[in-house]
Amino acid sequence: MGKITLYEDKAFQGRSYESTTDCPNLQTYLSRCNSIRVESGCWMLYERPNYQGQQYLLRRGEYPDYQQWMGLSDSIRSCCLIPQTGSHRLRLYEREDHKGLMMELSEDCPSIQDRFHLSEIRSLHVLEGCWVLYELPNYRGRQYLLRPQEYRRCQDWGAMDAKAGSLRRVVDLY
């Protein structure tokens, strides 16, 4: 079970909203979000309602302002708790529809280019666990939550292009 508290103002001030479940529309409770406390679990935050727009992965900890979670603004409109599993495994493909060279991964990968000599991933199949795909190496840039399922093209995970820099397992480390 997870628990997150979102605050309208920086440094955990102002009106707040506490949640233990997914919330498709935070605008009902808050007009903006400038700080967050994650008491348990791993959460994905979204800039728009209904789990759309820019995504931000937050683990247990305190985030006194939106720059701490690499946010571009105080616009957080939905959030979801990411389920935890014991094992993680996914397959990367160099072409759409799971064609071309296939590589399998079960650990974090800080640089897809260094490990697999690829700068783009055209399709994915998440076999176990949840992952976050980052557009840049070393877990930077746009983030995309990957749940166990098939992704036949980059648009299936919400990206505009196939640019891929790093992959990280979603694991609650505490």
UniProtKB/Swiss-Prot annotation:
Q: Which SUPFAM superfamilies match?
A: gamma-Crystallin-like
Disulphide connectivity of cysteines: none
Q: Which InterPro entries match?
A: Beta/Gamma-Crystallin, Beta/gamma_crystallin, G_crystallin-like
User: Which terms does the record give in the GO molecular function aspect?
Assistant: structural constituent of eye lens
- For the modification S-methylcysteine, the affected residues are 23
Give the region (Connecting peptide) as residue ranges. Answer: 84-87
> Any idea where the Beta/gamma crystallin 'Greek key' domain is?
2-40, 41-83, 88-128, 129-171
Key word Repeat present: yes
- Mention one GO biological process in which this protein takes part, according to its record: lens development in camera-type eye
Offer one Pfam family short name for this entry.
Answer: Crystall
Keywords assigned: Eye lens protein, Methylation, Repeat
Functional summary from the UniProt entry: Crystallins are the dominant structural components of the vertebrate eye lens.
Comment field on protein domains: Has a two-domain beta-structure, folded into four very similar Greek key motifs.
What is annotated about its quaternary structure and interactions? Monomer.
Q: Which family does it belong to?
A: Belongs to the beta/gamma-crystallin family.
Return the protein name: Gamma-crystallin C
Origin organism is Macaca mulatta
